[in-house]
């Protein structure tokens, strides 16, 4: 088992077209009949096509374009499609660029499989000024269930402003998932969240 893995955990891309079916067919390389059509969309769009956590939002307003959103499981769903086609994320992202996609947000996740990143120690060192830090904005969150024990509390640490174009999120993925009744091999996760405008 690798101690660390890197993955894309969230992606939002806007395309300069009003044709959502074109994006499904040519960028996602999926069949539109696999998608559920809804007469409402996210982010002010008029309609959306949904396949699990893959969402393609469309509007007749050409200035809005088509917005592709992949949440965590949507990224995993797309990875299965890419594997079946024998291609990788690099090829897919290049295809987005070929279709003049504008990347509005991308989250890169480093998965710590062995527990090498200790979130509590990282928080303590940050507060004690024992790390170089460009951003002075931070937020610490402890989450869990009231019925649980202190050991069930999952720690999250944000570095940077959530309103900026880049910020970091470090959290105890295994404990977070356990509180939801989900088993995972990922102990901790470090996310780099990059975004460009609304």
Language model regions located:
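Structured, helix-rich domain cores that form ligand/interaction pockets
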Residues: 1-198
């Amino acid at each position: 088992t690798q101690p660390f893995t890197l993955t894309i955990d969230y992606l939002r891309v806007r395309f300069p077209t009003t044709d959502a079916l074109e994006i499904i067919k040519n960028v996602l390389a999926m069949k539109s009949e696999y998608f559920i059509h809804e007469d409402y969309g996210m982010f002010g769009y008029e309609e959306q096509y949904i396949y699990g956590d893959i969402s393609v939002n469309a509007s007749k307003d050409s200035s809005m374009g088509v917005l592709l959103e992949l949440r965590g499981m949507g990224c995993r769903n797309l990875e299965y499609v890419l594997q079946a086609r024998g291609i990788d994320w690099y090829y897919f992202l290049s295809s987005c660029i070929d279709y003049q996609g504008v990347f509005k947000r991308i989250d890169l996740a480093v998965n710590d499989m062995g527990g090498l990143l200790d979130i509590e120690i990282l928080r303590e060192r940050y507060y004690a000024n024992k790390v170089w830090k460009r951003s002075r904005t931070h937020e610490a969150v402890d989450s869990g269930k009231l019925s649980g024990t202190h050991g069930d509390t999952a720690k999250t640490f944000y570095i940077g402003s959530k309103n900026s174009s880049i910020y970091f999120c470090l959290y105890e993925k295994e404990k977070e998932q356990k509180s939801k009744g989900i088993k995972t091999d990922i102990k901790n996760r470090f996310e780099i969240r990059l975004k460009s405008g609304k």
